[in-house]
A protein has these predicted regions:
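P-loop NTPase Walker
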Residues: 1-109, 220, 263
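Single conserved hydrophobic/aromatic residue that forms the stacking wall/gate
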Residues: 277, 284-285
Length: 285
């Protein structure tokens, strides 16, 4: 019999509810990490799932490292010898980057690509600001100020559009002049990334999504492999992250999401796939 430790009844239910779509509403300080750790161990010990068949997405690297450490320790205490590093644990960005690296030859990126951090991205736009300042309607889009400030505003627009997976052609053909300007800004920026063999944090997810959508074999291999997905802080996921989750989980449908805001979970409730609606208000809410 599985040793749940000091888990209460609601946590035990969350740990052992492994099949289908599972929603756990949980507030801060209510044992979310404890429950996710036990759930991963339960899958390995009781269900015979291999570490590489589990994906766990967090919103900070610190949270991901904590999960890895605690799962490793928990398995060691149970004398279960597996390589936890084979699990897909990390932020959405790190998980998407891992998928890209594993299939780099199927992306637009070459082997010596460079990943831009926030400053690098802003500096790239600043250094190439002349490519943006002649775009029709750019002055109406940006506030008055120097090129550095306006470069920062451009990056904000670009990142938001990338995260929401907005179609460039749709933007550029929109009836609204301001929307068309945004489309041109995004187009110029993406050309810069391609020319420089560059990728930034927001386009990591876009490139990963494109990779999966344009390469059926890669998608099917990942869908076969990743049998269980767990997403922490689900209410904070953006559109493209959600699309990637449901794309990867489309075969097995074993997706567990944890969130502390009922309103923020409405998208999951509206999923077309049947799911288990698990509430644990006494201990996980």
């Amino acid at each position: 019999m599985f040793n749940y430790g000091n888990a209460n009844e609601a946590q035990k239910e969350a740990i052992s509810a492994t099949d289908g779509l599972v929603l756990i509403t949980a507030g801060p300080g209510t044992g979310k990490t404890f429950t996710l750790v036990k759930r991963a161990v339960y899958l390995i010990q009781e269900c015979g799932i291999k570490p590489e068949q589990i994906m766990m997405a967090t919103f900070t690297e610190k949270a991901a490292k904590e999960l890895i450490t605690r799962i490793t320790n928990e398995l060691a205490e149970r004398n279960i010898s597996v390589n936890v590093n084979e699990m897909y644990i990390g932020t959405f960005h790190s998980l998407c980057l891992r998928i890209i690296k594993e299939n780099l030859e199927f992306t637009r990126l070459k082997r010596n690509y460079r990943l831009l951090d926030t400053f690098d991205q802003k500096y790239l736009v600043f250094r190439n600001f002349h490519k943006f300042k002649n775009i029709e309607g750019i002055d109406e889009l940006l506030s008055k100020g120097g090129s550095w400030k306006r470069s920062d505003e451009i990056c904000t627009y670009i990142n938001h559009l990338s995260e929401e997976m907005v179609d460039i052609e749709a933007l550029q053909s929109d009836d609204n002049p301001g929307i068309r300007t945004l489309g041109r800004v995004l187009s110029v920026y993406q050309e810069m990334l391609e020319e420089g063999n560059l990728i930034d944090f927001s386009t990591i997810q876009t490139e990963c999504y494109k990779l999966l959508m344009q390469n059926k074999q890669i998608l099917e291999e990942l869908q076969d492999k990743l049998q269980y997905l767990m997403i922490d802080e689900y209410q904070d996921t953006n559109y493209i992250q959600e699309q990637i989750v449901f794309l990867l989980g489309a075969k097995h449908h074993n997706i567990c999401v944890v969130g502390d805001d009922d309103q923020g979970l409405y998208r999951f409730r509206g999923a077309t796939v049947s799911y288990t609606h698990l509430r644990a208000h006494e201990t996980l809410a």
